[in-house]
Amino acid sequence: MTLIWIPLIPLMVKIVMKLVPDGKEMGAKALENPNYLDNKLIAQPAAALQLVAKEVMYCAKIVDEMIGKLQSGNGKIDKENAGIVEEKAKILQKLYASINDYFAALYSGGVLTEEQASQSAGMQSILCDIDRIGQLTREIMETVAKQNKGKHKYSKEALKELKKAMEQIQMIYGSCIRAISGNVDMDIKELMRQKEDIMQLDEKMRKNHIARVGK
């Protein structure tokens, strides 16, 4: 996560996301369209950047849901969850493109102050990280699903390790997103400790995989 940008994004502080009004489900086509961006506000960068911040946080929520789908069934990827992850990944890509187009319109308008340009760069960096996490999540889903359909399936131990890893990743990801949205203060030291735990787990998983393959 791009933590260094957090102090530069006051517009993202205390944003309260409400994804689906009244708890009603939205169709896939509606979800692919930006929920907050308004081209009529391009000439008003302060208001426009607030809308961008909300849209970025909406993308963050989508990725959080994608990661959560990789934790069900002790790491096994069933057809339903695979479809959900794939659908959300496509929605994320379209929103990512829409937000970047909106940024381009803001920049070309020549209305951003130096501070607003810095804030925009910070939000773009965070959006890029969120999109990358989402696409990597889809790749994990595709890899596991494909492997489990083949002759050499992942062992139960490997799938349990994957589930544990995704739980830890979702925890650290959630902490970052809550801090960016202004809901909690970020403990950088604790965040780095969690990151180190994930790195150690990654090393352990690799060693265990090699040991299992070598049997």
Regions found by a protein language model. Give the residues of each.
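Cytosolic, long alpha-helical scaffolding segments
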Residues: I4, L8-K215
